[in-house]
Amino acid sequence: MIKEKTNSTLTFEDFKIEVLKDYTTAIISRECSLLGRKEVLTGKAKFGIFGDGKEVPQLAMAKAFQNGDFRSGYYRDQTFMMAIGELTMQQFFAGLYGHTDIEQDPMSAGRQMGGHFATHSLNADGSWKDLTKQKNSSSDISPTAGQMPRLLGLAQASKIYRNVKGIPNAANFSNQGNEIAWGTIGNASTSEGLFFETINAAGVLQVPMVMSVWDDEYGISVHARHQTTKENISEILKGYQKEEDTNGYEILRVKGWDYAELITTYQKAAQIARENHIPVLIHVNELTQPQGHSSSGSHERYKNSDRLAWEREFDCIRQMRLWMIAINIASPEEIDAIDAQAKKDVMEAKKAAWNAFLEPIIADQKALVALLNEIAATSEHKEAITNYANELNAIKSPLKKEILVTARKVLRLIVAESGKAVLANWINEYTQKEQKNFSSNLFSETEKNVFSAQKVLPVYADDAKEDTDGRMILRDNFDAIFTKYPETLIFGEDAGAIGDVNQGLEGMQEKYGELRVADVGIREATILGQGIGMALRGLRPIAEIQYLDYLLYAIQIMSDDLATLQYRTVGKQKAPLIIRTRGHRLEGIWHSGSPMGMIINAVRGIHVLVPRNMTQAAGFYNSLLECDEPALVIECLNGYRLKEKMPSNYGEFKTPIGVIETLKTGNDITLVSYGSTLRLVQQAAKELSEVGIDCEIIDLQSLLPFDINQDIVKSIQKTNRLLVIDEDVPGGASAFILQQIIEQQDAYAYLDSKPQTLTAKAHRPAYGTDGDYFSKPSAEDIFEKVYDMMHESNPALYPSLY
């Protein structure tokens, strides 16, 4: 066991001031929770989830939390955020109301429900702030235990900064690796696999992580006996306890109502983690939930009278009050005065937040009412329009929706009248303004977004031949990347010692060390989380998921956390993580999947790149490292030994993102595909040319973003026919591709035949060469599909094959 140092002694007067300050923060937080619930139940807010019953341990955590540290927590941590000075009473209520002004609700500008916290890591131009000079919180998400994988990466970043030299601007992100990543989770959520995966990984990596489990014995209405073996998470994690000459954890237990012991425990945990990079788990038990889980219900429904009586007695604020009286910190009357002032201050903050939320909406309401009355004066529908205006004007607390609904309904009435233009213009301007409030920042809006990367062609020697294994091009390009960007690192299953399963990292660990080129365990979700957390702290991680089929283990974190990060923080945080994987065709159900439809529909907010060969893939990595956005790069699993030309400008050539490439020009039909399937398309096109069919072949290269220059429709204007070839299931990625071409690019007007798709079968691909042939599109399938489309247009020239 590791012993903590003794802290310097405060005078009693200093101690008293500190305790009273803490108590004031706790009681303010409690009053916010109580009043917040009332605001929901009276209809002013939609939903509330609060931190009541967890206030006192969060005070202790805040005392140990230093500048540069990061929090990765969940929706109970309002007291902590108040204690570190990152949440005011008025901001608390602004979040509850969903105020779309980032100044009023700095957590998410109303995009997340209240209780989801974040600090701002970026300046207005998207550049990094000095994170060592502020207390940091990564942005919360609701999915239970979803904060855990990211926590691992936040902690690992400190280890990287402590041990890897030469990282540019490291001093803005770390003070020699002394930062702690602080995690919080409810006891019930420790049942999630993400919790155990993270706990195990942090124990292996030995990173400075302090994990607090807030234990009130319930998960919504479900008691711990249904959640946790032995009803005690620290008991069942005993095997992780660090012993001499082993890795592992320090595991501490403390009662959530014992203020003094909580302070001691958190100071001890911080010292262990900060100085020694040993993870610590603090099991904070005997906590309560005075209002139940959320505003959706009451805990009286599932707790008996004895439990409710115990919760009233051992409410952490009540116990802190009794302790303060017992040691003469304050008299009951003095504490009552603090309580009364807190109630008054919270009420005033609530009113200020509500007025700030409502005033701009009322201004828009009045502006529209005035406009409608003006239009009504000369309209054939004066009575109806006046009624709409009066009904809108009568709403005391209008919603933006109600304003726009009224305007749009009136527009229908006056579609043939002179007032239409001014109202339509008002609607368009209002919609544009408000849509930005709700829809901006899905992707980066800075000058370093992916569209800033300019195409740089590979440079080849005059006598270059296609005689180099594709994997060697990747290897040599990664070598150039690791030299050029000291902040880059790559990690994954088999990525280290053997240089990945396809030798694309051959020799890299030996050259750059085990921290920058690392093997990890079989745990895809936390591989992804490592990348998110380190990217949040200024590093440029490349997280390798060994096969595309295994991405499903990580897809929830990709979808819920990484993909939404810039959106849910309104561009105030970023994690430019590169996810490297390999997929499409190889062997059998579990090593030849191409679930692209699932992926692209789950990860909007992450770019999805599908290079056809390793030169294109290497170019994507080079492009992405100049940008500030996350991306998934899917290398072709069956392409590592295929021959390509060897470039001479490794680390410099760049594949443009969102730009298609025409591999073959033609006049009869446009064939659109990507990845491994393109080689079959090229083979089929060659055979089709022998029967007089001239195909144009387009490599998408990128699914998200999709053909930003709208070049595909230009091809269709020439060929008037379209076939999308995809090895995903029917209606998978091919449906998205078709929607983009037909709807977004308006290609329908140029088609002489119906657009068609050729996809894999609905089942997973079967094993073996024959299994592949009967599961996924073959060259013969492509030939016959194209031939049939041409037969439809000219049966005489192209007689039916069957």
Model-based region annotation:
Residues 1-46, 67, 75, 446-457, ...:
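Cofactor-/ligand-binding subdomain signature composed of acidic, glycine-rich
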Residues 31-212, 217-219, 223-241, 246, ...:
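Cofactor-binding active-site loop characterized by glycine-rich and histidine/acidic residues
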Residues 55-59, 136-403, 637-802, ...:
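Thiamine diphosphate
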Residues 128-138, 146, 421-459, 604-608, ...:
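Helix-enriched interaction subdomains in cytosolic or periplasmic regions
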Residues 573, 583-587, 591, 596, ...:
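Active-site phosphate/pyrophosphate-binding segments
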